[in-house]
């Protein structure tokens, strides 16, 4: 019985993301619906933040799904729909940000800082090893040091 319940739970959990898009949102044209689903999978839900609007049940995600479908019905291209949503919500709405100079800096900065840190450590280690040992103390300096260190 427990195995049956576990199997049923796993089956229901595996199809749960398919329920995010309500039947009243589905377009009659299968090609447009496929494009709408593909676009919705690329856009982040601003409420859930780690889900696409295709997977989210939030009201904002529903509104965005309807907006995507409406724009597609009006003849917009996929890129035009995505650009429209980005213009209203910013780059953060994209689950996979576009490759631009600022994203290259964001992704490249950790590697640059790592290389700079390694170079700094190597230079510091070489400088430390290159120090010339001091000259030995003279008898007078040893005597003075002994006097200073005695209680």
UniProtKB/Swiss-Prot annotation:
Pfam families in UniProt: CcmH
Coiled-coil region(s): none
Main location: membrane
Transmembrane segments: 104-124
Keywords annotated in UniProt: Cytochrome c-type biogenesis, Heme, Iron, Membrane, Metal-binding, Signal, Transmembrane, Transmembrane helix
InterPro entries: C-type_cytochrome_biogenesis, CcmH/CycL/Ccl2/NrfF_N, CcmH/CycL/NrfF/Ccl2_sf
Single Gene Ontology BP annotation: cytochrome complex assembly
Localization: Membrane
GO cellular component entries: plasma membrane
Topology of this chain in the membrane: Single-pass membrane protein
Residues binding heme, per UniProt: 45, 48
Residues making up the signal peptide according to the UniProt record: 1-20
Top-level taxonomic group: Bacteria
An annotated Gene Ontology molecular function: metal ion binding
Disulfide bond positions: none
Function field: Required for the biogenesis of c-type cytochromes. Possible subunit of a heme lyase.
Family: Belongs to the CcmH/CycL/Ccl2/NrfF family.
Name by which UniProt lists this protein: Cytochrome c-type biogenesis protein CcmH
